[in-house]
């Protein structure tokens, strides 16, 4: 077992639905510690920078517009196999394909408004965490 850190974002649709506490409870019940957190309304430049890896994909503009449509909650999760554990909690990107009981199955409306983001690998987790948090903002 490897202790890892991963970035998680509760997206504007889930913030609007007021399910932040329910999502945090799932993280904690799965053994993930929230070691940094902030609420932020992303600027267009911040959203474009964060999702730059997708800039040539057809959904990029819609994704950026969605991510700046309201506030998000950004957190760093820490725990054993945190990346895989968080991805399991989130469920499939498309909530229609997500297993019952996952965050996306329970709280997401569509593949676009899919409630949460989570890092997919250790290198991207480290990069994504650095994008939003300085070392002095992380307590773990």
Curated annotation (Swiss-Prot):
Highest taxon, organism lineage: Bacteria
GO molecular function: ATP binding; metal ion binding; nucleoside diphosphate kinase activity
Binding-site positions, ATP: 11, 59, 87, 93, 104, 114
Entries under PROSITE patterns matching the protein: NDPK, NDPK_LIKE
Sections of the chain in a coiled coil: none
One annotated Gene Ontology cellular component of this protein: cytoplasm
Family annotation (Gene3D superfamilies): Nucleoside diphosphate kinase-like domain
Keyword Nucleotide-binding: yes
Active site residues of this protein: 117
Xref: InterPro entries: NDK-like_dom, NDK-like_dom_sf, Nucleoside_diP_kinase, Nucleoside_diP_kinase_AS
EC numbers for this chain: 2.7.4.6
Keywords: ATP-binding, Cytoplasm, Kinase, Magnesium, Metal-binding, Nucleotide metabolism, Nucleotide-binding, Phosphoprotein, Transferase
Localization per record: Cytoplasm
Catalytic activity: a 2'-deoxyribonucleoside 5'-diphosphate + ATP = a 2'-deoxyribonucleoside 5'-triphosphate + ADP; a ribonucleoside 5'-diphosphate + ATP = a ribonucleoside 5'-triphosphate + ADP
Cofactor field: Mg(2+)
Pfam families listed in its UniProt record: NDK (PF00334)
Record PANTHER family: NUCLEOSIDE DIPHOSPHATE KINASE, NUCLEOSIDE DIPHOSPHATE KINASE DDB_G0292928-RELATED
Family indicated by similarity: Belongs to the NDK family.
Subunit structure and binding partners: Homotetramer.
Protein name: Nucleoside diphosphate kinase
Species name: Francisella tularensis subsp. mediasiatica (strain FSC147)
Biological classification of the source: Bacteria, Pseudomonadati, Pseudomonadota, Gammaproteobacteria, Thiotrichales
Gene: ndk
